[in-house]
């Protein structure tokens, strides 16, 4: 089934029930259906095992962060002392298939576009989401962004990966603090209350190397 042809809406793509009724199904013989189910069950087991592996790697990063930085007496700064904050200017439907540059929106999926507005190292924080499930992406180079995507530049020569991790660790809290009804969103007032630990730069680099190594294990 190719349901994407029925998508409507820019901020929250959706499909009407009447469109589902237009789709047809291929009905295989019963024995063939059983074979397919057996294969799918094996796939589900592999996926579940892989999810457990990824969760364990995430726990390893968190444990390393606590070991290196928790209750060490390092300075703690608020959002506006850490980030230069701006946003993109485009609508989310400005993407182009096979475009030349990454286009960051509030979707977890990375889109493409043929023009760029930024050429830098940055963290990209989704500013709205239907369920308040935000994410943080890292990128260095030329890119563009949706008008509700926060583009974050560090004010000092700090590790982007360290602050990406600290932001990701706060996403559940941000979900709880979200405003809005059908579509949840974040404001600068909410973000401005967040605090970040600022360890020495050599320890930031050490943590970044560790995270990079663990991340490589995730894609093996």
What positions do the PLM features span?
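Non-catalytic DNA-recognition/assembly elements of restriction-modification systems
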Residues: 22-38, 46-105, 193, 197-220
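Compositionally biased, intrinsically disordered low-complexity regions enriched
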Residues: 85, 91-95, 118, 169-170, ...
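Short glycine/serine/threonine-biased micro-segments
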Residues: 7, 86, 97, 178-179
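A short beta-sheet element
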Residues: 1, 8-12, 16-17, 105-109, ...
């Amino acid at each position: 089934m190719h349901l994407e042809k029925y998508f409507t809406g820019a901020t929250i793509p959706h499909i009407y029930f009447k469109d589902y009724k237009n789709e047809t199904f291929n009905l295989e013989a019963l024995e063939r259906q059983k074979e397919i189910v057996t294969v799918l069950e094996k796939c589900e087991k592999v996926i579940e095992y892989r999810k457990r592996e990824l969760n364990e790697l995430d726990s390893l990063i968190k444990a390393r962060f606590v070991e290196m930085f928790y209750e060490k007496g390092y300075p703690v700064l608020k959002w506006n002392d850490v980030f230069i904050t701006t946003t993109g200017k485009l609508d989310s439907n400005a993407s182009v298939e096979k475009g030349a540059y990454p286009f960051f929106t509030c979707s977890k999926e990375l889109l493409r576009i043929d023009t760029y507005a930024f050429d830098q190292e940055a963290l990209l924080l989704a500013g709205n989401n239907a369920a308040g499930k935000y994410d943080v992406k890292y990128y260095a180079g030329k890119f563009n962004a949706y008008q509700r995507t926060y583009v974050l530049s560090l004010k000092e020569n700090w590790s982007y990966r360290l602050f990406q991790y600290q932001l990701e660790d706060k996403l559940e809290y941000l979900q709880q603090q979200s405003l809005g009804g059908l579509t949840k969103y974040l404001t600068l007032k909410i973000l401005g209350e967040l605090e970040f630990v600022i360890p020495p730069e050599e320890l930031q680099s050490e943590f970044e190397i560790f995270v990079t190594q663990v991340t490589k294990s995730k894609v093996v």
